[in-house]
Structure formats: C-alpha cells, structure tokens
C-alpha cells in the first residue's frame, strides 16, 4: 500500500507545478476573503451558529433519549410488575385467609377427636375404677378381717391360757388347803390330848402333895376342841374361780366388730360402684360446648399496603432520576457548547493558518488537505510522531493516527462510549430500584407475619375456650366419680377409727380393771393400731390424688406448622409457605419484581456488550493500523532498478518562466525527508526542499549525500515537518479581525 503515488519517471513529461502560470503567479501572495464577503465555504460566524449541534451535545442528547426510553420502559415494566404483584398478592391473600381460617375447618375434627378421647378415657376410667373399687373393697375387708381375727386369736390364746392356768392353780390350792387343814387339825387334836393327859398326870402328883398339906384342887382342863372344829371347817370358797371362769366365758369373739367393720367398709364401695354402674353407659360428652372459630378474611393488598407504597416509592425514584438525568444531560449538552465553541474558534484559526500551506507547492497537497480538514487528529499525529526519529517511522505513526481517527472510526468509538455511558445511567437507575427490593421483601414477610398472627390468635382463642371446656369436664368427673372416691376414703378412714374405738370399748368392757387390760391394749396398738395408721395414710394419699386431669390444648395447635415454615426460610433453599413450589426467591410477590429487574439488568448487560463490542472494534481498527505500519516499517522497498517505484513526493522547485520548457519531468530531485531550516532566515511559511537535480552518471558528492539520497529514495509523502513549518508562521490579527500572516505586508 503506497501512501502517495505519483507518475513514474518513465511517463510522458508534464510541466512542473506552476510551470503553466505566469511568473507573477509562481509565488503568489497569500490572499483572504475580505470581511463580510460571500464565500462558498462556511465562515467563522456560520461555524459558531452550528455549535449547538456539536458531536458531544448530540451524543449527550442521544444518551438522554436512550435513558428516557429506558425510564419509560422501566415504568411500563414496573406497572406490569405491580399488576403481577397485586395478582400474586391477591392469591397470597386468599391463601393466607384460607390458612387463617384453618382453625374454623380443623376445629370440628379436633373437637370431635377431643370429645371422643374424653369419652373413651372416661369410660375406661370408670371401668378401671369399678374393678379397682371392687378389688380395694375386698382387700380392705380382708385386711380388716385378718387384723381382727388375728387379734382375736391372740387374745383368746393369751387370756384363755392365762385363765385356765389360774383356775387350775386355784383348784389345786383349795384341794391342798382342805386336805392339809384336816391333817393339821387332827394332829393338833392328838397333840392337845396327849399334852392334856400328861398335864393331868402332873397335876395329880401335885394334888397328892397338896392334899398332904390339907388342901386339894381340881386341875384345869385344856379345851381347844371348839377352835379345832373351826379349823376343820376352814375351806377355800367355791367362788374363788368363778371370776376367772366368768372372764374365760366372756372373752369376745369380735363377731359384732367384724360385722360392723365389714358393713362400714363396704358401704362407700357399694355407693361408688353404684354410681359408676349408673354413669358408665350414660356418659356422653357434649360436643356443642367446644368452640368453633370464625372464618378469617385477611386484607393486605388494599390501598394502604406495602405493595402500593413500594411501587409508589419506585415510581417516585424513577421520576426523580428522570428529572435528574434530564437536568444533568441537558446541562451537559448545553455546557458542551462552550468548550466546543472555543475549540471551533481555535479550529478556525488553525484552518486559516494552515490554509497558506495549500498555496505552497513544496508540500503534499493531500497531506495539506488532511491537516487543514482534520486539525486536531492531524495535530495529535504530529505530536505523537515527534516522539520518534525523523523518517519513515514518523510517517507511519501519523498514518496510524489518521487511520484510527477517521470519521467512521471516531463515530464507532463515540457510539460505543455513548452506549456505555447510557448503560451506566441505566445501571444507576436500576441500582436505585434494586435497593428498594429488600423493602418489598420485608413487607411480604410482614404479610406472612400477619397470616401467622391471625392464625395464632384464632388458635389461641380456640385453645382457651377448649381448655375451659376440658377444665369443666375435669371438675365434673372429679365431682361425680372421684367425689365418691374421696367420700369413700374418708368413710373408710372413719370406719377404721370406729373399728379401733369399738375394739377398745370391747376390751375395756372385758378386761377393764384387770391386770390384763394394759398388756392387751399394747398388743392392740402394736398389732392393729400401727396397721390402721398405715392404711389411713394410704387413704389420705388417695384422697389427695384421686382426681382426673386431662391435658390442655396448646395455644399454637393450628399455627405451629406456619411458624416453623417461616423459621425455615433462613435455611438453604428456603421455600416459604407463601411461595409457590420451586420459587427460588423469598416469595411469589418479590419474585415478580426480581424478574423485572433481572430482565432490565440483562437488557443493560446486552447494550453494554454491544457498546463494548463497538469499542473493541475500534481497537481492532487501531490494531490493524499498527500491524500494517509495523509491516511497512520493517519491509525494505525495492529500488527503481528492481521494478520499484519512487514513493517520495518531489515538488517542483519554483523557476523562471524561461526555464520551464527546458526542465524534464524525468529529473529526480533530492528532496530531504525532514524540515529544512530557512536559509534566508525570513521565517518562511514551510520548509523548502532541495531542487538540485541528480546528474545521471555524475558524482553525488560526499558519502553523507549518498546516504541521504538512498534514504530519500524510499521516502513517503507527508514526511515534511509541517508542525515546525506551522510554528514558524508569524500571524497576527488586524483591527478588523482579518488574519494576516508573517509574509504579509503591514
């Protein structure tokens, strides 16, 4: 690819630039249109009149239009989302009302279940009580009989044995005494008779002596016969053992005690069994006493609910963002006119400055046109090219800049940047909308809380009323059934006390005043009293604990499952009872808004990808230019002798009119690739090129000239130091506003 091609030297000769002009036109003085003159091109004021349609203002207005379209679409999407959310809310409201009315529908079944449970429990309890009462009755009677019979046996053993021994001792003592007294009396009589005989003999001797003295007395007689007769008549009274026999005959058999105790013990048991038998088939739980909660009608989709407030807030945010975007972008579009006006003024000056290059014949006309028509991109190319060494690389760098900054390429880049800026504006708006989505989620969670609260209130009221019925049932059963149990325990306790008292009375009547009374009372307390106390303690425990207590219904009977469902929302893959199965969002209502925001986000992402692709396409163009320039930079061009062409621009040198005809087009001019200093020092408009033709077959001068010549053979158009030439332009502005250049006369 050649950047500037000219007619090869083998072509027919053409007159050099300006050869056909008269001598005075070969170096014409720069001329400009007078102020106010009509020109076919736009003047300074005309250019300023179109500042308002500069590219940046237009781009900002296009961005504004795209943002307004996005805002309109977002409003439409939010309106659609609101309709869907309200529809979903209505469905949730209906489902929530149905759930809140669950106690109404479930209470009948639960009430029937509770009533049946109570009936079966009471019937089973009565059957058990009937069997238990009968068993306890027989056990108590048996135990009391065991105690009384045992005590009777012990008393009979102790008292009868003692009395029989005592009677035997008394009888033996009486027999022994009667026999002994007879023998003693007979012995005494014999002793007294012998003693009396001896006394009489003794007295007879004494009387014989006394008769000698003249007196005689009769001896006294010892007469104890009467006393001995009394002694013989001593006998133990026959009534000595009558008391013992009476005691033996009066030992109680406790038949009356047993009969009294049995009757007293069996009476309460009979009454309890009678009551149980009467109530066993008659008990029927009254189901009408159970409460039935009313149906619930929830309403959280009205005018003052969170959904309308959420979408109202979203609409307010969108409206505010729309106003902000309109104000900012319009202000930016208007503000862009100021720097663009300054740039247009500068461009106009540069164009007038560089327009003088067109009149010079020592520059590539195409390059000059490019510099004049694209002042900023060409200036950028010149600036960047100045970083490299003079020569082909500078030309290639300028060509890269020119290739990447063509009008289509810049339009592509500007379109991509504007698209990204539009996406950024839409993303800001979408971010503001998405920030409010958690608020809707909170509102929806409050819907669930409302459902659970209503459900919990209904469940609690039902549980309170049901528990009151259960408490009344407990009291009724405790009074009708266990009331007799308490009465029976009290009666049995009293009966045992009466039994002990009656037994004590019998013993007092029997052994009162005897030595056996104390031991028998001790035996009674040890054998019966301690046992009776144990029975009384047991009866007291039965009295204290003999009552039925059916369990109450918990307050969360109908709301427990809903509460657990909400509690499980914080776990992985939650599925709220307000959400449809398979929803990945918190609930169906939030899913509507999330779906809309995700659709808008996908659209923004698509636009961003398209804009990025446009920018990437511009970079691809830049890469193509760089690769092409690198290829040309490192490729050696063929010399003319090998079939190559001279790609270097050689402007004709200004000559006199008479010399034009003698100049051949085939002459080769030694044109340096860099700017040549002005030898005259007059600040020329542009660098001058050497017009010394190469003399074929002659010497080229020094080796340096030879190297320059070889380098210049491969030159390209546009390698001239235009920037230096332009910098050397001395311009000024006259009082009338006309731009005058350094070469102009003042």
UniProtKB/Swiss-Prot annotation:
Places the protein is found: Cell membrane
Key words, A-Z: Cell membrane, Conjugation, Glycoprotein, Membrane, Transmembrane, Transmembrane helix
Annotated spans, Disordered: 1-32, 682-708
Membrane topology designation: Multi-pass membrane protein
UniProt keyword Glycoprotein present: yes
Domain of life: Eukaryota
Coiled coil: none
Glycosites: 178, 248, 277, 457, 486, 493, 508, 555, 570
Gene Ontology terms: cellular component: mating projection tip; plasma membrane
TM stretches of this protein: 51-71, 139-159, 324-344, 399-421, 607-627
Chain ranges on the Cytoplasmic side, renumbered to this chain: 72-138, 345-398, 628-746
Side Extracellular, residues: 1-50, 160-323, 422-606
Cross-referenced InterPro entries: PRM1 (IPR026777)
GO biological process annotation, one example: plasma membrane fusion involved in cytogamy
Function: Involved in cell fusion during mating by stabilizing the plasma membrane fusion event.
Family designation: Belongs to the PRM1 family.
Protein name, as recorded: Plasma membrane fusion protein PRM1
Species classification: Eukaryota, Fungi, Dikarya, Ascomycota, Pezizomycotina
């Amino acid at each position: 690819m050649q950047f500037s091609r000219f007619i090869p030297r083998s072509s027919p000769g053409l007159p050099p630039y300006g050869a056909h002009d008269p001598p005075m036109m070969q170096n014409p003085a720069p001329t400009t249109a007078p102020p106010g003159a009509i020109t076919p091109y736009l003047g300074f004021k005309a250019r300023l009149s179109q500042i308002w349609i500069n590219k940046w203002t237009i781009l900002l207005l296009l961005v504004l239009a795209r943002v307004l379209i996005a805002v309109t679409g977002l409003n439409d999407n939010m309106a659609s989302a609101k309709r869907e959310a309200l529809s979903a809310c209505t469905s949730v409201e209906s489902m929530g009302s149905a759930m809140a009315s669950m106690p109404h529908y479930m209470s009948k079944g639960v009430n029937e279940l509770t009533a049946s449970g109570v009936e079966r429990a009471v019937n089973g309890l009565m059957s058990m009580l009937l069997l238990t009462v009968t068993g306890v009755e027989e056990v108590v009677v048996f135990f009391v009989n065991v105690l009384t019979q045992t005590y009777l046996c012990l008393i009979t053993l102790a008292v009868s044995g003692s009395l029989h021994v005592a009677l035997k001792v008394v009888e033996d003592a009486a027999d022994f005494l009667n026999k002994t007294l007879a023998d003693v009396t007979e012995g005494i009589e014999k002793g007294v008779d012998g003693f009396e005989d001896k006394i009489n003999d003794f007295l007879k001797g004494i009387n014989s002596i006394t008769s000698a003295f003249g007196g005689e007395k009769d001896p006294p007689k010892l007469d104890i016969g009467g006393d001995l007769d009394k002694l013989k008549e001593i006998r133990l009274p026959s009534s000595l053992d009558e008391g013992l026999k009476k005691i033996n005959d009066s030992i109680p058999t406790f038949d009356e005690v047993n009969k009294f105790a049995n009757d007293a013990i069996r009476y309460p048991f009979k009454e309890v069994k009678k009551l149980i038998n009467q109530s066993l088939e008659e008990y029927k739980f009254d189901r009408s006493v159970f409460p039935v909660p009313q149906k619930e009608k929830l309403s959280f989709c009205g005018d003052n609910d969170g959904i309308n407030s959420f979408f109202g807030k979203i609409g307010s945010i969108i409206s505010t963002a729309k106003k902000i975007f309109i104000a900012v972008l319009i202000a930016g579009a208007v503000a862009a006119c100021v720097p663009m006006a300054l740039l247009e003024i500068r461009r106009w000056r540069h164009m007038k400055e560089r327009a003088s290059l067109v009149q010079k014949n020592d520059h590539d006309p195409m390059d000059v046109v490019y510099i004049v028509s694209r002042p900023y991109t060409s200036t950028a190319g010149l600036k960047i090219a100045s970083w490299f060494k003079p020569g082909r690389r500078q030309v290639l760098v300028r060509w890269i800049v020119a290739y990447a900054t063509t009008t289509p390429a810049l339009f592509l880049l500007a379109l991509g940047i504007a698209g990204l800026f539009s996406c950024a504006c839409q993303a800001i708006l979408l971010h503001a909308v998405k920030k409010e989505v958690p608020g809707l989620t909170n509102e929806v969670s409050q819907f669930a809380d409302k459902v659970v609260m209503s459900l919990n209130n209904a469940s609690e009221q039902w549980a309170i009323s049901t528990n009151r019925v259960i408490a009344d049932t407990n009291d009724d059963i405790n009074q009708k059934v266990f009331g007799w149990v308490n009465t029976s325990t009290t009666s049995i306790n009293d009966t045992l006390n009466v039994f002990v008292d009656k037994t004590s009375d019998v013993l007092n009547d029997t052994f009162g005043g005897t030595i056996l009374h104390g031991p028998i009372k001790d035996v009674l307390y040890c054998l019966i009293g301690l046992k009776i106390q144990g029975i009384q303690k047991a009866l007291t425990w039965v009295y204290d604990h003999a009552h039925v207590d059916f369990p109450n219904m918990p307050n969360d009977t109908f709301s427990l499952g809903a509460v657990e469902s909400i509690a499980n929302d914080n776990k992985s893959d939650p599925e709220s009872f307000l959400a449809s199965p398979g929803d990945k969002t918190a609930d169906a209502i939030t899913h509507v808004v999330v779906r809309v925001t995700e659709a808008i986000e996908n659209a923004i992402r698509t636009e961003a990808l398209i804009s990025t692709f446009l920018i990437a396409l511009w970079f691809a163009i830049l890469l193509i230019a760089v690769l092409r320039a690198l290829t040309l930079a490192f490729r050696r061009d063929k010399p003319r002798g090998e079939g190559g062409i001279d790609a270097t621009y050689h402007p004709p040198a200004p000559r006199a009119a008479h010399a034009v005809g003698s100049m051949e087009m085939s002459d080769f001019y030694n044109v340096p690739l860099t700017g040549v200093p002005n030898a005259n020092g007059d600040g020329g408009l542009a660098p001058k090129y050497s017009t010394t033709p190469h003399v074929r077959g002659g010497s080229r001068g020094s080796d340096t000239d030879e190297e320059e010549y070889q380098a210049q053979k491969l030159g390209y158009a546009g390698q001239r130091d235009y920037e230096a030439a332009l910098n050397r332009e001395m311009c000024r502005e006259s009082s009338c506003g006309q731009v005058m250049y350094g070469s102009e006369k003042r």
